[in-house]
């Protein structure tokens, strides 16, 4: 079964780069441009993994993670934060909100795909 991944980032070019990498590895990709937009994309979808930026307009990534973890259908869905922030305090804040993994941009595609594969394991 193909796994579906929601990619949330306010940068269209970053969503495109991540999307190409994931699609080439056989994943189905849904995109959201910020946390609020991404929440609307979750309705009626089955998503196996969420990859989210932290700093976004309208709704930031940490607030988005908190909202997702309150949703019955997604409370156990793994979330990876993919961000330019390397601050340990911010990372702890993301983990406390419910993010399972934290990857700093720029990243190597192989690194991203390795993390995705681990997070998508049953």
Tell what function each PLM region has.
Residues 16-24:
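Charged docking surfaces used in two-component/phosphorelay signaling
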Residues 26-33, 41:
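Short hydrophobic/Thr-rich beta-strand motif most characteristic of the beta2 strand and flanking loop
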Residues 46-51:
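Active-site beta3 strand of CheY-like receiver
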Residues 53, 83:
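Active-site residues of response regulator receiver
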Residues 56:
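Receiver (REC) domain active-site loop signature in two-component systems and cognate sites
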Residues 100:
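Short, glycine/charged-rich "phosphate-handling" switch motifs in NTP-dependent
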Residues 107-117:
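C-terminal output helix
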């Amino acid at each position: 079964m193909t796994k579906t991944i929601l990619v949330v980032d306010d940068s269209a070019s970053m969503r495109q780069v991540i999307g190409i990498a994931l699609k080439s590895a056989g994943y189905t990709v849904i995109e959201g441009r910020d946390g609020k937009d991404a929440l609307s994309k979750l309705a009626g979808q089955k998503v196996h993994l969420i990859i989210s930026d932290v700093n976004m307009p309208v709704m930031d990534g940490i607030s988005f993670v908190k909202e997702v973890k309150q949703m019955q259908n997604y409370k156990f869905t793994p979330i990876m934060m993919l961000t330019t922030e390397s601050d340990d305090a911010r990372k702890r804040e993301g983990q406390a909100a419910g993010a399972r993994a934290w990857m700093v941009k720029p990243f190597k595609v192989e690194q991203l795909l390795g993390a995705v594969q681990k997070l998508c394991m049953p």
